[in-house]
Amino acid sequence: MPLNFPLRIRFFAHSLSGTHLSYNTSSSVPLLFRIFSSGLNHFEFGSRINFSTRPNRDQPEFERRIRDGGEIRASKSLIEDEEELSNWVSGFRTGSSRGILKSDDEDEEDRSRGRNQEKRGIRNQVDSFRNKRYGGDRERGFNSRIQGKSSEASFRGRKETSFSRDREDEKGLRKREDLRLEDESSDEDVKSLVMGDIGDLLSEDDEEEDQDYDFLKKKAVSAFGFDKENVIEADKTRNANDSYLTKTRFDHYPLSPLSLKAIKDAGYETMTVVQEATLPIILKGKDVLAKAKTGTGKTVAFLLPSIEVVVKSPPTSPDNKRPPILALVICPTRELANQAATEANTLLKYHPSIGVQVVIGGTRLGLEQKRMQTNPCQILVATPGRLKDHIENTPGFATRLKGVKVLVLDEADHLLDMGFRKDIERIISAVPKERQTFLFSATVPEEVRQICLVALRRDHEFVNCVHEGTIETHQQVRQMHMIASLDRHFSLLYTLLREHIMGNVDYKVIVFCTTAMVTKLVADLLGELNLNVREIHSRKPQSYRTRVSNEFRKSKGLILVTSDVSARGVDYPDVTLVLQVGLPKDREQYIHRLGRTGRKGKEGEGILLLAPWEEYFLSSLKDLPITKSPLPSIDPETVKKVQKALCHVEMRNKEAAYQAWLGYYNSQKMIGRDKDRLVELANEFSRSMGLDNPPAIPKLILGKMGLKNVPGLRAK
């Protein structure tokens, strides 16, 4: 039937002489939607018309057979397919009316900003259909067979911008930026303050466009059959009460005898569920995306086969001054990187010729360069920001990465949630396409599904060790929540800790706080109350964080007060209680925090302490076995003791905690949308610290948060 194009896209008609327009045909390629998605959505073509640049005959979609000497080359990913279209459509690209938010690559806790950046960045690109290819209902899963690796050319046009740092125009923020770059620490407080309520920046028009976009994405996914689930379920016969261990022994698989000997020395007798499910697939040479609960042996699951690849690789000539790095492990935080390297050294006990090196922020770049040059470095464990520094500044480092045979993204969801997507894409482009890639994570949100497009091969396997209908937390962990006004939180925290200590001789407690400076405040308070306390957060130097982390790992009778730098993957054995004070960022963060206890099948306890206006968060946990607990009685003497201890906490720490608290909750959409109410709650928090008047906040910061001239705030 004849079609009349709207005036705004009619100019394109002459270039479509070979284009076949199909009506209500789901098997054709919606090419114009990749180019004019916003325009066509505006004119309501999305649900009626599909476009194909194919001749008017039936052909398999996206099946490219390129003959070279009679052989069929390896199939390309959708990203590479669209790379070939880039020149053709370049003349028709127009800039989006929405800017792309950039996040600092080295910010380890810039989670909220990272998600918003990715959301806008994806909508801002012509290849948005590619990035959203796994769309649709998250519960429906996705087809892992259609994914592929991206070539270096896929990111050629983005290399110059992938690692460009944000420059703050205001002189008052430049000093903070320099300090953050020097320590590669996540300055969660300043970041959240500067970002403000970023969710409110989306207009109603943006939200309507998102709905149209999601509808188009789902139709495209359905048209190509990408919504059909292709998942390997790990031993579905096991119920939720089963141990995380299996009966399968490591020597059941063809592993190096020296590796098996090291495994035995480490006390590992049988495999965990995730190890049993992934090892045979990886040994076949396939890529893997694995979802498993925290504390179930994911680190060994990816390290052991990585070591096997290194063992089977031909030895490097001693004359080679730049020997290749064979296995590259990317971790989101320094603590996780150090932990993975320690585990690797344990497994390499009888492989003296194989070396593991760690490159993380907070240490001198020159020392790392020297260590990698003088010591064996077949396996490299790194955080994304520091790895980027070496790619840019270490001579010959990029050449060494050309030898990578195994790439591992540990805690993949956290890497992307922190805004490291650009770093990950750059790293993928720096290593060979012919490699094995493993993504291990406790959760698989949309961001992880998107990175699969560029990181994994089309024939990769999705191993799901968290079955549908089972809970995502360990059954042996007793979960409770308590609701109390802010003015009672400090007294309740002290009472809960004191009762737990009295009932557990070998107590080992982790207290999670919302921000680094609130963590500092709580640690100071508990120290004034004569509790045995240590603190870890992004404001502490790396040497201190490593020392405290090792001390807490080996000790008992200790309380660790921490921000979310300790929330993911860090293995602290025998933690008896995890106490979360205040609103977690989201459901996944609650699960990860809780996962610090109940590890390796041991029992544990988790308490979530919220204010009445934070109670809405519990609706996201309704499928978890968390129960409401009555508040313990607090005697007047305890209240006086806590108030006296608060008086001894330094005023500057209270001021910093107030500002950080305000910035954190300003970024929570349910709370930050009402600025007047937000300020009332912040001042309630100020009074809970024993302050009669709320601390003054710089006008620049208030402006960045969108809180200028809000009643109840003091500016300076």
UniProtKB/Swiss-Prot annotation:
Positions annotated to bind ATP: A292, K293, T294, G295, T296, G297, K298, T299
Which residue ranges does the record assign to the Helicase C-terminal domain?
497-643
**UniProt-recorded name of the protein:** DEAD-box ATP-dependent RNA helicase 31
Q: Where is this motif: DEAD box?
A: 410-413
EC number(s) in its UniProt entry?
A: 3.6.4.13
| Pfam families found in the cross-reference section | DEAD (PF00270), Helicase_C (PF00271)
Residues annotated as signal peptide: none
Location of motif Q motif in this chain is 248-276
Note on domains (UniProt): The Q motif is unique to and characteristic of the DEAD box family of RNA helicases and controls ATP binding and hydrolysis.
Q: Hey, which family's this protein in?
A: Belongs to the DEAD box helicase family.
Q: What class of enzyme is it?
A: hydrolase
